[in-house]
Amino acid sequence: MGLSAPKNKIKLSHDPNNTKWSGNTDSFGHRMMKSQGWTPGEYLGAKDAAHAEFHTAANASHIRVVIKDNNLGLGAKIGSGVGHGECTGLDVFQNLLGRLNGKEEAEIEKEQKGREDLKRAIYAERKWGSIRFVRGGVLVGDKIQDLIDGEKERVKALKKGKTAESSSDDSDSSSDEEEEEKSPEPVTEKKKSSKRKREEQEEEEKTSSKKSKKDKKSKKRKSEDEDDKDKSESKKSKKSKKDRKSKSKSTSESETETLDEAAIKARKKEKKEKKRREKEAATAGADTEETSSTSKSSKKNSKKDKHKSSSASESSTKESTPTVTESSGRSTPMGIRSIRARHIAQKRMASMDVASLNQIFMIKSQT
């Protein structure tokens, strides 16, 4: 950008080394720690804590902040740790400096050996990690040496006692021979006793193993018997549950059947009542239709009678012969059938009258 770039002005502070905050005694934290019993120069942390013995001078210094500008892990540093920061050929140079300073060859060799041991330790740590050797116990063979030595000492003590009691050299020689002959006996007896002990131990182990096997078999039988009992009980319980379920199902089915029968009967009754009501309504409608039809027919008959009377008057005037209407000869019935009978009588009269037929069939009368 050059001169046209934005200018960033940096103002130097009065405390370039950033030591003002460490020397400030008026801050809140400094005053609070003083009120709790801390004095400048003491370690940070509780004095009576379990880890107080591990406090060092670092606990008295300030907490320093370091900017992390690498890809290493937290707390890792380049050139620190085991095997880091060593120069090749430095051992030979240190030996040369030691000789020039007047050190003896023994001291130089000792230092060289220490450096070589350090290199071996570094290599082993890199390859297998930290190794610690722990001292184990002493391996004991088949023979118990302490018991054999004790037996020999006891035999020697017996020999000394017998030699003191005997006075003659012959008796001493004979006693020595006898004791020499007897001396291997306790060892053999000891060996025999050890063999017997071993045999007894083996027999005890066999008997214990047999007992354990018998116990295991008895336990297995008991467990099998218990399992059989549990299975039989479970089967019985299942059967009882099935019986209960079947009974409950039968009762429920019978109840449902009774309910269904009652519902069917109620439906039948309702259907019968509906049919009766429909029949009654139909009969009532038919009666009303008959009454309406009879009223209409009576009106029509009255009109026809008027037409007949008019036609009869005309014919009487023309022909001058009176027309006599024939009576049905039947008495008018009373009741519901009277309307029907009237309608039938009117039809008969109309069919017998020529003028009315002409009017019905739209035939003009001849004048």
Swiss-Prot record:
Acidic residues bias spans: 167-182
GO CC, alphabetical: nucleolus
Gene Ontology BP terms: rRNA processing
Single GO MF descriptor: nucleic acid binding
Pfam families found in the cross-reference section: G-patch (PF01585)
PROSITE patterns linked: G_PATCH (PS50174)
Annotated localization: Nucleus, Nucleolus
Stretches with biased composition (Basic residues): 209-221, 236-248, 265-277, 297-309
Top-rank lineage group of the source organism: Eukaryota
Biased composition (Polar residues): 15-27
Keywords: Nucleus, Ribosome biogenesis, rRNA processing
All copies of domain G-patch, residue ranges: 25-79
Transmembrane annotation, as ranges: none
Comp. bias (Low complexity): 282-296, 310-328
Principal location listed in the UniProt entry: nucleus
Chain intervals for the UniProt region annotation (Disordered): 1-28, 156-336
Family stated for the protein in its record: Belongs to the PINX1 family.
PANTHER family membership: G PATCH DOMAIN CONTAINING PROTEIN, PROTEIN PXR1
UniProt function note: Involved in rRNA-processing at A0, A1 and A2 sites and negatively regulates telomerase.
Name under which the protein is recorded: Protein pxr1
Organism: Sclerotinia sclerotiorum (strain ATCC 18683 / 1980 / Ss-1) (White mold)
Gene this chain is encoded by: pxr1
